[in-house]
């Protein structure tokens, strides 16, 4: 087995008008550097740890973790719509191995994924279907959330399974860092929205357009400093990245969910995908990060970060 990693933030605003062109140029240049790393590595298989934003997973049965044996993209924010190339038998074997490692994970033979999964695939490969991919959902939005150490355990179990394969595997993690965009919660949503995030009715084109408009307006206000959204926290982001870069993943076990929310915002819990991805990478031994990028990107409502990593020879 060969193993490499690429971790990157995502933002629907990368696909929408509004962000400053100089910021987009800088972010896209960093993504291009990561994409070149991926191109040179040329993986046979991709495993992506990613969240969802009430497009595929809902409160009617909100799993902490779920491995997709089939997946289809919903096409939000201009991303790919339709089936991904999921190797069903291999995904099922991965789930069996993870369960055998005492990590409770659900499986799905009909997983819907959104931009949190698809955007990194498109940015790194050009298309979302360029490589076989096993999608692994991590709940990072719908409270109650489990402790961060369970995300590390998930990643270790997945990495142990990957170590048995005679394949070149790229592990991707998607999301983070500090950000608190306008996403509904079970307790704050109005009755119509609450019904949708519980029971999962698909958005109509008009509803999806309205949601997109809300995000664009929120980003405009946030970048102008006229927003009630929780500010970004670059100091906290850098602290997290330092822990990741140094391979001290167990240090994050001490971070409570309330601490993550207080310091990083409501969706900073997407760092869970980073923890799982780097824990999978660590199964191959000590690693070194290569591409390192961070930007306090108010226009994207995110502390936007990218890391690539390979095992230390």
Swiss-Prot record:
UniProtKB keywords: Aromatic hydrocarbons catabolism, Dioxygenase, Iron, Oxidoreductase
Pathway: Aromatic compound metabolism; 3-phenylpropanoate degradation
Enzyme class, first EC level, given as a word: oxidoreductase
EC code(s) of this entry: 1.13.11.16
Active site (catalytic residues): 115, 179
Family per record: Belongs to the LigB/MhpB extradiol dioxygenase family.
Function (record text): Catalyzes the non-heme iron(II)-dependent oxidative cleavage of 2,3-dihydroxyphenylpropionic acid and 2,3-dihydroxicinnamic acid into 2-hydroxy-6-ketononadienedioate and 2-hydroxy-6-ketononatrienedioate, respectively.
Biological source species: Mycobacterium ulcerans (strain Agy99)
Cofactors required: Fe(2+)
Protein name listed in UniProt: 2,3-dihydroxyphenylpropionate/2,3-dihydroxicinnamic acid 1,2-dioxygenase
Gene3D superfamilies hit by this protein: LigB-like (3.40.830.10)
A molecular function (GO) term: ferrous iron binding
An example Gene Ontology biological process: 3-phenylpropionate catabolic process
NCBIfam families: PRK13370.1-4
Subunit structure: Homotetramer.
Reaction(s) the record says it catalyses: 3-(2,3-dihydroxyphenyl)propanoate + O2 = (2Z,4E)-2-hydroxy-6-oxonona-2,4-dienedioate + H(+); (2E)-3-(2,3-dihydroxyphenyl)prop-2-enoate + O2 = (2Z,4E,7E)-2-hydroxy-6-oxonona-2,4,7-trienedioate + H(+)
